[in-house]
Design a protein with these regions (language model features):
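Transmembrane helix-bundle signature of multi-pass secondary active exporters and lipid flippases
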Residues: 27-80, 144-151, 240-305, 326-333, ...
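Alpha-helical transmembrane segments of multipass membrane proteins
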Residues: 39-42, 114, 156-160, 182-187, ...
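Helix-loop interface residues and adjacent transmembrane-helix termini in multi-pass membrane transporters
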Residues: 39, 48-51, 85-88, 163-164, ...
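Short runs within selected transmembrane alpha-helices of multi-pass transporters and secretion channels
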Residues: 75, 143-162, 170-181, 199-214, ...
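Short alpha-helical transmembrane segments in multi-pass integral membrane proteins
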Residues: 1-24, 82-147, 180, 191-247, ...
């Protein structure tokens, strides 16, 4: 196919299992490295600042996810649309979709930047952030939001490259940015004693670097993937298609994060030790989840290209292989974290009060993280087929509504930290069962 270049993968021909791994593993590495660099923020403030600084950074994670997940979902929409056009080899539409996606990314980033400055303190107060960390949490969040245009540009540009089968160069950009982030963290916190503001500044600078690298790559690609500044603009037909896929996915992520914000509010009620412990353990949860998410994104891209090319049997194989790989790799990584919990958790804190809560979260949630494969892979396959609303609705019900009901009923009656944590595996089982059933029914009707 003419749009296939040396950095891309031909998803519509040849053996699938090796191409899925070649695509997914750099994608997983990108997400894990991104979280690792975020974990450096947490570890540096936890070890070289204070437990309050650690809690301030950790208390923002669910709120940050809430703000950006809508636009990450839209970037997924651009991935599906561009992948579909690549499968059909419609060059004009590929270019139009790429330029539309970049404009949407930058405009959305500016919007979130401005909005974030106004809502930071009111929302953190509404979440019940402990008084001993509220000022630090607000400071971190406001600085973090300055980098939103660059965060979204990286997400959209990497989505564009991944739609062509290129998951390696986004990884290289992330590695370069992460090295800068780590170095700045150590300098600004340890040497200049800037605390949470130091790690926030380091994050902003690293996001500028990663997005800048990917923009440079797109500016020097061959057509129709090349980004041409004079061609930047919004194509309404392509925007409509991107939003049809992206908005349901984004709203799902946003509502999902809203449920986590409510859970975070409940965690806050246990005090700063619980907030810090949960934040420390959550890092390992993210590592395991991003394995699943990488194979889910692989399912989206491979399914979309093969569906566009009319290769329906390969769509079935993509689902089967991504599910197997997701369960296997996530299960192995979770086992490493759980078995080595004493070593890993002490990287973040030596406070015994904090460790009590961290161990509880690790044993309950991280141990069973592989269960998320059921709904993530199935939902990804459905989006690859062009159906985004159904998996969004299922996820909102199974992983959001159920969690909110649990928090407002069971957790109020039994105010124990482990009671809050156990809703995660419960919701994963329910959501996964419904999602797999929906995918199989949809696939039967489609081909």
């Amino acid at each position: 196919m003419e749009v296939k270049k040396k950095n891309t993968i031909d998803m519509t021909h040849g053996t699938l299992w090796n191409k899925i791994l070649i695509f997914a593993l750099p994608l997983a590495a990108s997400s894990i490295l991104q979280q690792l660099f975020n974990s450096v923020d947490t570890a540096v403030v936890g070890r070289f600042a204070s437990s309050q600084a650690l809690a301030a950074v950790g208390s923002n994670s669910s709120l940050i996810s809430l703000m950006i997940n809508l636009f990450i979902g839209i970037s997924l929409g651009s991935n599906v649309v561009i992948s579909h056009y690549i499968g059909q080899n419609v060059k004009k539409n590929i270019s139009a979709a790429i330029h539309t996606a970049v404009v949407v990314a930058f405009v959305s980033g500016i919007f979130v930047l401005v909005l974030g400055q106004f809502i930071a303190k009111p929302v953190l107060l509404l979440m019940g952030t402990p008084q001993d960390v509220i000022d630090l949490a607000v400071l971190y969040l406001r600085i973090y939001f300055i980098g939103m245009p660059f965060i979204l540009l990286y997400d959209f540009c990497s989505s564009i490259l991944r739609s062509t089968g290129d998951s390696r160069r986004p990884l290289y950009a992330l590695i370069a940015a992460g090295i800068i982030n780590t170095g700045l963290n150590l300098i600004l916190v340890i040497i200049f004693h800037l605390g949470v503001s130091g790690v926030a500044i380091a994050t902003v600078v690293s996001n500028i670097v990663s997005s800048g690298i990917l923009l440079f790559i797109l500016l020097h690609e061959e057509e129709p993937i090349r980004l041409i500044p004079s061609a930047l603009g919004i194509s309404l037909p392509e925007l409509k298609k991107i939003l049809q896929i992206g908005v349901p996915a984004g709203l799902q992520g946003m509502v999902f994060s809203l449920a986590n914000v409510c859970i975070q509010s409940t965690i806050n009620s246990f005090g700063s030790a619980a907030v810090a412990g949960s934040a420390a353990a959550l890092n390992f949860e993210f590592f395991a989840y991003f394995i699943v998410n990488a194979f889910a994104q692989t399912a989206v891209t491979f399914t979309s290209q093969n569906y566009g090319a009319g290769e329906f049997l390969r769509c079935r194989k993509v689902f089967r292989l991504t599910m197997i790989f997701s369960l296997l790799f996530c299960g192995l990584l979770s086992a490493v974290f759980v078995l080595g919990r004493d070593f890993f958790l002490h990287l973040y804190t030596n406070d015994p009060d904090v460790l009590v809560f961290a161990v509880q979260r690790l044993l309950i949630a991280t141990t069973l993280e592989l269960l998320t494969s059921a709904y993530e892979i199935s939902g990804g396959a459905m989006r690859g087929l062009g159906h985004s609303l159904l998996p969004a609705l299922i996820t909102v019900f199974g992983s959001c509504v159920l969690r909110l009901i649990w928090i407002s009923t069971v957790c109020r009656r039994f105010h124990e930290f482990w009671v809050v944590m156990i809703i995660y595996p419960i919701s994963w089982v329910i959501t996964g069962t419904i999602m797999i059933t929906a995918y199989l029914l949809l696939r039967h009707e489609t081909f």
